Curated annotation (Swiss-Prot):
Pfam families assigned: ADK
Binding residues annotated for AMP, in chain numbering: T31, R36, T57, L58, V59, G85, Y86, P87, R88, Q92, R139, R150
Domain notes: Consists of three domains, a large central CORE domain and two small peripheral domains, NMPbind and LID, which undergo movements during catalysis. The LID domain closes over the site of phosphoryl transfer upon ATP binding. Assembling and dissambling the active center during each catalytic cycle provides an effective means to prevent ATP hydrolysis.
E.C. no: 2.7.4.3
Pathway connected to this protein: Purine metabolism; AMP biosynthesis via salvage pathway; AMP from ADP: step 1/1
UniProt entry keywords in alphabetical sequence: ATP-binding, Cytoplasm, Kinase, Nucleotide biosynthesis, Nucleotide-binding, Transferase
Purpose of the protein: Catalyzes the reversible transfer of the terminal phosphate group between ATP and AMP. Plays an important role in cellular energy homeostasis and in adenine nucleotide metabolism.
Renumbered residue ranges of the record's region NMP: 30-59
Subunit structure: Monomer.
GO terms, molecular function: adenylate kinase activity; ATP binding
Compartments where found: Cytoplasm
Reactions catalysed: AMP + ATP = 2 ADP
Protein name listed in UniProt: Adenylate kinase
Length: 192
């Protein structure tokens, strides 16, 4: 099962990705985790990514695309994967499609979690409170101003992916406002 999870920040993509991975025994491919791993291993592409990050610039699409392509080649992805946080743009989606075709693979589904933006802000605030209570580190972008910027960026860059995947008959919409377990059940239903 090869799945892409879409949805705005705070929609629960990471939570649902973990549940799908447990159910289907496939890895979660998070761009953040993959970037950290290639940097930690000091691979050639990891060195390039680290240089961009150290220079204060976004890691280029070409590097992110290569990291994802290389990760899909690893043996634990043979039976599938859940992509979380990638693709973020139609350009990345087009590259992903080409990469998968070159490997004789294709996506099985693209799940978009539909969530009310006001509710997302409340979720973010709750996550901050829970993290503080647990003595954890609060993400630097977990504040209302940064969160609003992330939502704008999502609407401008990532939301157009819905139409891209709808045209390819891969898009499945799931209400992300219901409970975590119920969202998971709905996802399993649309994957059948």
């Amino acid at each position: 099962m090869r799945i892409v999870l879409l949805g705005p920040p705070g929609a629960g993509k990471g939570t649902q990705a973990k549940m799908l991975c447990e159910e289907y025994h496939i890895p979660q491919l998070s761009t953040g985790d993959m970037l950290r791993e290639v940097i930690r291993r000091e691979t050639e592409i990891g060195k390039k990514a680290k240089a961009m990050i150290n220079a204060g610039t976004l890691v280029s699409d070409s590097i992110v695309n290569q990291i994802v392509s290389d990760r899909i080649d690893e043996s634990d992805c043979i039976n599938g994967f859940v992509l979380d946080g990638y693709p973020r743009t139609v350009g990345q989606a087009e590259v992903l499609q080409q990469v998968l075709q070159s490997k004789n693979m294709q996506l099985d589904a693209v799940i978009e979690l539909i969530v009310d933006e006001d509710a997302l802000l409340e979720r973010m605030k709750k996550r901050v409170q829970e993290t503080i209570i647990a003595g954890g580190q609060v993400r630097s972008d977990d504040n209302p101003v940064a969160f609003a910027k992330r939502l704008v960026e999502y609407r401008e860059k990532t939301a157009p992916l819905s139409e891209f995947y709808l045209q390819r008959r891969l898009l499945k919409l799931v209400d992300g406002m219901i409970g975590v377990t119920e969202v998971s059940r709905k996802i399993r239903e649309v994957l059948k």
